[in-house]
Amino acid sequence: VPISPVCDLAPLMDTTMNEVLRIDAAEAQAESPVNMGPPHGLDLSIWVGADERPAFLEQAGQLARAWGARRVVEEGKHHFDVIDGLTDPDSPMIKALLGLK
């Protein structure tokens, strides 16, 4: 269950963060999960908060499409609290992680 994933590193090349990261086009292509095949034998869900920045929502959608996975957009959650479900053993996120849906 990728949570708020950054799955395509190419957009980072055009940010000031890349002064530190130093990602080039070849590395962005090779290291971006969206360009890799999905893990085999897993029922995947890509989790993202509905109140996240548009880039995170798009990246989650992009990965879900590329991997043929379900995208879960959790209402009322943002990038820093979308992981709250990890603390609740009965949460939909934990059920997805355990394959219980």
Which sequence ranges carry the predicted segments?
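Alpha/beta-hydrolase superfamily serine-hydrolase fold, recognizing
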Residues: 1-101
